[in-house]
Amino acid sequence: MPELPEVETSRRGIAPFLQGKTLSHLTVRQPRLRWPVSETLLTLRDRPILSVQRRAKYLLLELPEGWIVIHLGMSGSVRILPALTPPQKHDHIDLLLTDGMMLRYTDPRRFGAWLWYDSLATASVLAHLGPEPLSEAFSAEYLLEKARGRRTAVKPWLMDNTLVVGVGNIYASESLFSAQIHPDRLAGSLSADEAHLLVQTIKAVLQRSIDQGGTTLRDFLQADGKPGYFAQQLQVYGRAGEACLTCGTTIKRSKHGQRTTFYCPHCQR
């Protein structure tokens, strides 16, 4: 699933081609995604795109009348292509520009979304989200306050979007390893020093992934069609049975709900 670094990588890739340009119209070949494609999108004609933003894992295209809100789902990606590029099997939506280019949305598993909101204040999908992890609002003090009394394992707790957005399975595993915190530790047991270190490692891991164009494990591609390269730097995720790169201990895997967790039993306490 594309996580925050992949979505931010996509935003940075498409923004120069969309921002300040004019939307001609949209072509929707498959409206049945996670939620039905908003019918308003089919009525848009010759509208300027004012900005290309991101909130959590959502891409936000600002138009004068409202916002196109895009979620990449489990397997989605967006690319900038010439408008006459023939569609392939899983190319479900094209946003065509008046300059002869287009934004193409590809989603093999069709679990993404293309929605319309007159205002972000009414965007139900953005309600109740926690702070951005790379913002000043996500601090050690904030994390420690939220952790107080929590008897939830720290790994799934970090993945709760009401706590902080965009720390998905890959980056929660990698951040906990870097902070040397066992994923089964209770959130409420974190010390002030551990909270400080964990916040710093989350920010560092996410920033490194953004700098590397995200993590491509299966379907994700950058806006130019290239994969992300952070997968080559993963320390524990997907490495069960292999030696820890720090101490040589065998990397273990466990389940938290439906998510697989990877960790080093020696480095993480």
Swiss-Prot record:
**Which SMART domains does the record match to this protein?**
Fapy_DNA_glyco (SM00898), H2TH (SM01232)
Q: Subunit composition?
A: Monomer.
Any one GO MF annotation of this record: zinc ion binding
Named cofactor requirement(s): Zn(2+)
Q: Which InterPro entries match?
A: DNA_glyclase/AP_lyase_DNA-bd, DNA_glyclase_Znf_dom_DNA_BS, Formamido-pyr_DNA_Glyclase, FPG_cat, MutM-like_N-ter, Ribosomal_uS13-like_H2TH, Znf_DNA_glyclase/AP_lyase, Znf_FPG/IleRS
Q: Which cysteines are joined by disulfide bonds?
A: none
Q: Carries keyword Ribosomal protein? A: no
Q: Which UniProt keywords apply?
A: DNA damage, DNA repair, DNA-binding, Glycosidase, Hydrolase, Lyase, Metal-binding, Multifunctional enzyme, Zinc, Zinc-finger
State the gene name recorded for this protein: mutM
Q: What is its EC number?
A: 3.2.2.23, 4.2.99.18
The name on file for this protein is: Formamidopyrimidine-DNA glycosylase
Residues recorded as binding DNA, renumbered to this chain, are: 90, 109, 150
Q: Where is the active site?
A: 2-3, 57, 259
Where do the zinc-finger regions (FPG-type) map? 235-269
